[in-house]
Amino acid sequence: MFRKVLVANRGVAAVRIADTLKRLGVLSIGLRTTEERGNKYFERFDEVYDLAGDSVSETYLDIDQILEIANLANAEAVHPGYGFLSEN
């Protein structure tokens, strides 16, 4: 079982994944854009990292940036969620 997973998604999908990881005893890592900083749902994650960029293609679809954050956070896996990375 993984001990720490980066969730490469946002909104309801990301929260559901984070909640499931918590029930499994796995630490969750969330990603957010500058616009999303005030959203309360990020409190559901064990760690949160900011994505650089303005558009979806510069943030949630930037695979290199997401993998860089995963390495920085010592994530053992990346969950793509629904849409975004799961479609690429």
Where would I find each of the regions flagged by the language model?
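ATP-binding N-terminal substructure of ATP-dependent carboxylate-amine bond-forming enzymes
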Residues: 1-88
